[in-house]
Regions:
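Short, flexible loop segments at boundaries between secondary-structure elements
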Residues: 145-155
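Structural beta-alpha unit
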Residues: 88-117
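Small/aliphatic-rich secondary-structure junction motif
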Residues: 2-64, 153
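Residues at the starts of beta-strands that form the adenosine-phosphate
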Residues: 3, 29-33, 93, 118, ...
Length: 155
């Protein structure tokens, strides 16, 4: 049975990733371990140019670091649970975990605990993806002797 490490968060549920799951299952017995890095929910507006420039913000209304982290974990958990349910509906053997916010750390942990035949990294498109901006695919290829497939969601 081939074991696949799938690393994704915001792209879980996307058609491109679903197509890869179906392809791997069609090749033969497959087991998927899905890691959803708990990307911090740091969606705060930092450029107020449209409003005439920066303006003072009352710090008491900003989320705390713990709130940002907790929201990121909750989003990753919801995405992961939805994807695992989808995979089970397809008849796949699948499980997973919410991982470290740093995707490389999450991958290292998974590989330290289990053996995989392939890593499937699912990202947002270039220009939006922080993972691509961090050169994550090349870093993974350099560090691990495991085939890597990069799945990029459309714009």
């Amino acid at each position: 049975m081939y074991r696949y490490l799938v690393v994704a968060n915001q792209t879980l549920g996307g058609q491109e990733l679903q197509d890869v799951f179906r392809d791997r299952m069609a090749r033969g017995p497959a087991q998927f371990w899905v890691v959803a890095p708990a990307t911090p929910a740091t969606q705060l507006i930092t450029d107020f140019g449209a409003l005439g420039g920066a303006f003072p913000v009352d710090p008491s209304i900003l989320p705390t670091a713990a709130e940002i982290r907790d929201e990121g974990v909750a989003v990753a958990r919801a995405n992961l649970d939805t994807e695992l349910a989808r995979l089970h509906e397809l008849g796949a053997v699948a499980d997973g975990a919410v991982g470290d916010p740093n995707p490389m750390t999450a991958i290292e942990k998974a590989i330290g605990e289990q053996q995989f035949d392939e890593i499937i990294l699912s990202t947002l498109p270039t220009g939006i993806s922080r993972w691509l901006a961090l050169d994550l695919p090349h870093r993974i290829r350099r560090k691990f002797d495991i085939p890597l497939t990069v799945v990029t969601a459309p714009r």
